[in-house]
Design a protein with these regions (language model features):
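Short, hydrophobic-biased segments on the C-terminal half of alpha helices
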Residues: 42-46
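Conserved G/P- and acidic residue-centered "switch" motifs that form tight phosphate/ATP-binding loops
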Residues: 41, 73
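N-terminal helix-turn-helix DNA-binding core of bacterial DNA-binding proteins
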Residues: 1-40
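Amphipathic alpha-helical dimerization/coiled-coil segments
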Residues: 75-103
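Beta-hairpin "wing" of winged helix-turn-helix
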Residues: 49-66, 71
């Protein structure tokens, strides 16, 4: 699910984002539920990049060390579409069970 939400955030962004921006965005849209340790995002971002779903570029920062900016790739957008469909189907099935709809 972390991979899914990271791809979704980057897929919705018009500009590349660095880790802190991504973490803040998750806090905003997830109403705190998706908030977590920022450091936990970096291994997932690196894995997504290793699979070709993201690409990154390091750029200098005026306020500190260089920042690595991430953007979603075409392959990442395709994976995001597939994962959203799978998540929706899973969520619907779980909701049905939780609501006692299984007879």
């Amino acid at each position: 699910t972390v991979s899914l939400v990271l791809l979704a955030v980057l897929g919705q962004s018009r500009q590349p984002m660095y880790g802190y921006q991504i973490a803040k965005r998750l806090e905003e849209v997830g109403e705190g539920v998706l908030a977590g340790k920022q450091s936990a995002l970096y291994p997932v971002l690196r894995n997504l990049e290793a699979y070709g779903l993201l690409e990154s570029e390091v750029e200098p920062s005026v306020s500190g060390p260089p920042r690595r900016y991430y953007r979603i790739t075409k392959l990442g957008r395709e994976a995001l579409r597939e994962w959203v469909a799978a998540w929706s189907a899973t969520r619907d099935s779980v909701d049905t069970v939780l609501q006692g709809g299984v007879t």
